[in-house]
Amino acid sequence: SGCVVIDNEAGSHALVRHLAARGFRKIAIITTFPHLPTMELRHRGYLRALAEAGLHADPRLYGEVAYAGYRQHVCDTLDRILAMVPDTDGFFFTTHILATEALRYFHDRGIDISDGRLGLACMHEDPLFRLAAPRMSVARFPVEEISAHAVRLLLRQIRESQSPGSVRPAPESVVLPCRMEFRDE
């Protein structure tokens, strides 16, 4: 067996480091399923980038969204963060689904995201972002490479299962980098 994953920590770190380099100082993280290794790595990248930029990881800027009823939870989470830290100037979304709901929230509340005063960054892309948030930086997943490696690993697994008595090699894990797109420059 084996697996193909993206480098979640490096992608998150690069996005948040970019926001900090652009001068954003109060960068919130909006996440879900914090117990999953993927989300843990994304959170770790966020924290590491803040620390390297000399920024305090303010717990009031941490937004955890429950999956069930996530549309309302995103609104409630953003309401809470903006009430506690009204000068929040950046948002890092750990998934494109959370970012999409946040864009709806910003639109519904008349929060202008087009002028660059709010830094926006997201792990993964949604075609909507180019229209609704063209300045949102994203870590694009290399879908074609992921597919190619997954097929290669699957074919290897099939070959090995058809060779009785053969020595099974150790499972192979492939970690691929994200393609960073800093769109606010």
Regions found by a protein language model. Name each.
Residues 3-14, 30-77, 92-101, 122-126, ...:
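Hinge/beta->alpha junction and helix N-cap segments in small-molecule ligand-binding domains
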Residues 24-26, 89:
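Short acidic/polar active-site loop segments enriched in Thr and Asp
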